[in-house]
Regions:
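Short, charged low-complexity intrinsically disordered segments located at boundaries
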Residues: 27, 49-50
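Short hydrophobic/aromatic patch on the recognition helix
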Residues: 43-44, 48
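Alpha-helical DNA-recognition elements
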Residues: 1, 50-51
Length: 67
């Protein structure tokens, strides 16, 4: 069981998949967001920032530096 609603869980899965796509396939934020079902790049960026604590570009730069 999780403390998340089904909608929150689905959103978390989509954002994690978008993050994986950006890291492993080199997609930009707009393309990754679109691939996981976001139609609006600004909505994707807003929800990504809430989930990971930074916008996609800054989060990915930080992750790549730590590899």
């Amino acid at each position: 069981m999780t403390a998340m609603s089904p909608l929150q869980y689905q959103k978390q899965l989509r954002l994690n998949e978008a993050r994986r796509l950006m890291l492993s396939e080199g997609l930009d934020a707009s393309a990754a967001g679109y691939r996981v079902g976001y139609e609006s790049p600004s909505q994707f960026s807003r929800e990504y920032s809430r989930q990971f604590g930074a916008p996609p570009v800054r989060d990915l730069a930080r992750l790549r530096m730590s590899l």
